[in-house]
């Protein structure tokens, strides 16, 4: 492959990673799931993302998983009515 094709392939992979992350964010924020089901969705997204980007487990754990977990935390606070006491 030439450098141009490598760049195009990388851009396509990153676009797919973004879509997986965006869909996961949407599901976690809007779907009706138990906590265990939500964690399963996160693990599924992790598998998809690491298939696209092998060897990037640390990046997932440091950047992407916290984003997903933050959504679950915010949603739980809203559902429990705890946001009034936090804000």
Describe every region a protein language model picked out.
Residues 7, 35-50:
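Short linear, low-complexity motifs centered on an aromatic residue
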Residues 2-35:
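N-terminal acidic leader/helix
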Residues 6-12, 39, 60, 68:
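Helix-centric, low-specificity signal for extended rod-like, repetitive segments
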């Amino acid at each position: 492959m030439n450098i141009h094709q490598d760049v195009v392939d990388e851009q396509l992979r990153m676009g797919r990673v973004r879509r997986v992350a965006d869909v996961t964010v949407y599901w976690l924020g809007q779907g009706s799931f138990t906590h265990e089901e939500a964690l399963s969705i996160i693990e599924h997204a992790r598998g998809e993302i690491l298939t696209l980007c092998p060897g990037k487990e640390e990046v997932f754990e440091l950047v992407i998983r916290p984003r997903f977990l933050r959504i679950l935390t915010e949603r739980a606070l809203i559902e429990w009515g705890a946001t009034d006491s936090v804000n």
